[in-house]
């Protein structure tokens, strides 16, 4: 059986990541010009930025259960529709209240897509390519962020912040149309009794009719337990939950989204003008995309855990240097350029490690019967972390200064290194069913899923 090309399948599957990235990055430039027209003060500015995250928390909290009930495809379709409505709404918002409302709607889309897209890609991909294909989500996030920075720069002189925000509706319409032609996750179909349809999709995805072993492992995993929030806290599932929540929370508290959200302000603080600051973020966005491509190339060769540990070390060093430079050499040309270089190094190591790896691992860690809700709860924790960081950054900046803030993030990075070393298991080169069986065996659950040699998943 000739294998069909799945390039477009994975592209549209990951397009939700681009929308998340765009809406995350575009606000950093738009907020510089929005303040004057909408009359924002420090409080309402923080409200506009953080309202998306409030919606994301609500969206990711509901998405896991909804996708387990209605399917991955319908959930992505709902996210695309919300992205479109939210994008148009923020572009046309006449005042702060309406802006916050539609930012919350965008957040619902973000929460849904960040839960479902990694899960969907993970369930479609063969095991030997799962890391690379699941990393497409993070690649598209970085592409979305880069595009938002470019759009910000193009419209900066005209202060056309409404165009900056409104252009997000274009790719959301593309996703809404594209998802109509995408297959449902075969694993979800099996859990909902649509075996014949699931087999046909698997045959097309794998390019072979020899999928009996893969089907056997999916069936065995599916019939082990009923899935729900209660089952997520079963003793044998708990290590996966701890790892998922920890990775999601720590990814944000290393300070990554602080750099993304407030990169223009960071550049301004070290002496750059508004346009130069936005152009600087375009450079950071470009590095982010290029290094995520490197991650896609190496993640299935090197493994998830080594990349996380490497990333921790690199980010901690960058943050310490940033802190020392701004503490002892503030307001000098050397400090300004050293800051830019260190931000670049931080992005490089993040983009080949914690950026893609966390999104890849979240759906990998959880057993089939709680994969949707487990990924949803972990993603909820990720957005809670993002919200806390975005709200506390300006407060801490004013209270203790950027140098000590970077030192706090560095200390959290050291804790993250220890967490990965002792609490996170390697998932490279194993099928989802084999990962589940290993979790069962290590925690006295037993079961049949994945006991045989698994091929093709």
UniProtKB/Swiss-Prot annotation:
Keywords: Cell membrane, Membrane, Transmembrane, Transmembrane helix, Transport
Annotated segments matching region Disordered: 438-457
Molecular functions per Gene Ontology: D-glucose transmembrane transporter activity
Family matches, as PROSITE patterns: MFS (PS50850), SUGAR_TRANSPORT_1 (PS00216), SUGAR_TRANSPORT_2 (PS00217)
Spans through the membrane: 7-27, 38-58, 75-95, 97-117, 136-156, 163-183, 240-260, 276-296, 309-329, 340-360, 377-397, 400-420
Membrane topology according to the record: Multi-pass membrane protein
Coiled coil: none
Keyword hit for Membrane: yes
Pfam families from the UniProt entry: Sugar_tr (PF00083)
Keyword Thylakoid: no
Domain of life: Bacteria
Gene Ontology cellular-component annotations: membrane; plasma membrane
InterPro entries for the chain: MFS_dom, MFS_sugar_transport-like, MFS_Sugar_Transporter, MFS_trans_sf, Sugar/inositol_transpt, Sugar_transporter_CS, XylE-like
Gene Ontology BP term (one): D-glucose transmembrane transport
Locations listed in the record: Cell membrane
Family: Belongs to the major facilitator superfamily. Sugar transporter (TC 2.A.1.1) family.
Protein name as catalogued: Putative metabolite transport protein YwtG
């Amino acid at each position: 059986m000739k294998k069909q090309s799945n390039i477009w399948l994975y592209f549209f599957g990951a397009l939700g990541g681009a929308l998340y990235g765009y809406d995350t990055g575009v606000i950093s430039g738009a907020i510089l010009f929005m303040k004057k027209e909408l009359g924002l003060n420090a409080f309402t500015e923080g409200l506009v930025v953080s309202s998306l995250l409030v919606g994301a928390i609500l969206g990711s909290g509901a998405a896991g259960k909804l996708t387990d009930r209605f399917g991955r495809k319908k959930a992505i379709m709902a996210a695309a529709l919300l992205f479109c409505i939210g994008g148009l709404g923020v572009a046309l918002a006449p005042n702060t209240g309406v802006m916050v409302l539609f930012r919350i709607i965008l957040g619902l889309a973000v929460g849904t897509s960040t839960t479902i897209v990694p899960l969907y890609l993970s369930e479609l991909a063969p095991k030997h390519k799962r890391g690379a294909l699941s990393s497409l989500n993070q690649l598209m996030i970085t592409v979305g962020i880069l595009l938002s920075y470019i759009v910000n720069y193009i419209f900066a002189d005209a202060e056309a912040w409404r165009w900056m925000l409104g252009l997000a509706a274009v790719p959301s319409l593309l996703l809404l149309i594209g998802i109509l032609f995408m297959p449902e996750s075969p694993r979800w179909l099996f859990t909902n009794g649509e075996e014949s349809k699931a087999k046909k999709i698997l045959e097309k995805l794998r390019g072979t009719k020899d999928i009996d072993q893969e089907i056997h492992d999916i069936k065995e995993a599916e019939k082990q337990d009923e899935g729900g929030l209660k089952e997520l806290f079963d003793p044998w599932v708990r290590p996966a939950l701890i790892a998922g929540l920890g990775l999601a929370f720590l990814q944000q508290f290393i300070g990554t989204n602080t750099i993304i959200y407030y990169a223009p302000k960071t550049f301004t603080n070290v002496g750059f003008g508004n346009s130069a600051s936005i152009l600087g973020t375009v450079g950071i966005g470009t590095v982010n995309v290029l290094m995520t491509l490197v991650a896609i190339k190496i993640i299935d060769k090197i493994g998830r855990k080594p990349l996380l540990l490497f990333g921790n070390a690199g980010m901690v060093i960058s943050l310490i240097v940033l802190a020392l430079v701004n503490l002892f050499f503030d307001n000098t040309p050397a400090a300004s350029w050293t800051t830019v270089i260190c931000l670049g190094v931080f992005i490089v190591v993040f983009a080949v490690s914690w950026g893609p790896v966390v999104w890849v691992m979240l759906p990998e860690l959880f057993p089939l019967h709680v994969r949707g809700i487990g990924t949803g709860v972990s993603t909820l924790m990720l957005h809670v972390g993002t919200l806390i960081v975005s709200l506390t950054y300006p407060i801490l900046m004013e209270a203790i200064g950027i140098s000590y803030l970077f030192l706090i993030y560095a200390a959290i990075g050291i804790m993250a290194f220890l967490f990965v070393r002792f609490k996170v298991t390697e998932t490279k080169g194993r099928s989802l069913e084999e990962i589940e069986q290993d979790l069962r065996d290590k925690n006295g659950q037993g079961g049949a899923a994945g006991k045989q040699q698994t091929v093709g998943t």
